[in-house]
Design a protein with these regions (language model features):
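Short hydrophobic beta-strand element within catalytic cores of glycosyltransferases
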Residues: 90-93, 103
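Short alpha-helical segment that forms part of, or immediately flanks, the ligand-binding pocket
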Residues: 59, 77, 81-86, 100-101, ...
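A short, well-ordered alpha-helix in the C-terminal region of glycosyltransferases
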Residues: 133-148, 157
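Aromatic "clamp/platform" in nucleotide-sugar-dependent glycosyltransferases that forms part
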Residues: 73
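C-terminal alpha-helical cap of glycosyltransferases
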Residues: 31, 151-168
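Conserved catalytic-core segment of nucleotide-activated headgroup transferases in glycan assembly
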Residues: 1-37, 43
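Nucleotide-activated donor-binding/catalytic signature segment of Leloir-type glycosyltransferases, i.e.
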Residues: 27, 31-61, 67
Length: 168
């Protein structure tokens, strides 16, 4: 459901096309050996954000990455997209479910059509690297987070909604 196969194949495509790329896989307790043993895969495993040591490891991983690729096939509300923006990681994903609430094409990542392939992802990422969009999205992703993807903004919106409803 999360599109791990596409993420792996995209990373493979990028490497085969002259763009040295590592895929850091976070969140899977037991990654299949055939994936884990690929030379471009870093198996981080599941990290519990409630455990300070594991949380710090997650933050360290984020700081050493340049983008989030999460080609999920079904997603209502992915906190990972908001967190990626907070740390300046552009996100590459499918346009499905609630994802358009989190990703603004060209600002904090890109949403691809559901029929897109790993090569489509690879070509887009390669083009973003070549023309500087990836670097620009690093800054604008943080802006998107500050404008709309953080808990303070959510609290203000909820407060306004409740106030509007109770004033009627």
């Amino acid at each position: 459901r999360k599109g791990g196969d596409i993420a792996v194949e995209t990373t493979k495509w990028l490497n085969e096309n002259g763009i040295p790329t590592q895929l850091h896989i976070v969140g899977i307790k037991s990654l299949d050996d055939k994936i884990k043993n690929l030379p471009f895969v870093q198996d981080i495993g599941f990290l519990n954000k409630n455990n300070k040591t594991e949380y710090n490891r997650l933050i360290d991983e984020i700081y050493h990455c340049h983008a989030l690729i999460l080609p999920t096939h079904a997603e209502c509300s992915a906190i990972a997209f908001a967190e990626a923006s907070a740390y300046g990681l552009p996100t590459f994903t499918f346009q499905t479910g609630g994802i358009p609430n989190y990703i603004e094409n060209g600002r904090n990542g890109y949403m691809l059509a559901m029929n897109s392939t790993s090569e489509d992802y690879g070509r887009l990422i390669a083009q973003c690297l070549k023309d500087g969009r990836l670097e620009r999205m690093t800054n604008s992703a943080k802006e998107v987070y500050l404008e709309k993807l953080n808990w303070n903004v959510w609290a203000k919106k909820m407060n306004n909604l409740i106030t509007d409803l109770t004033d009627k």
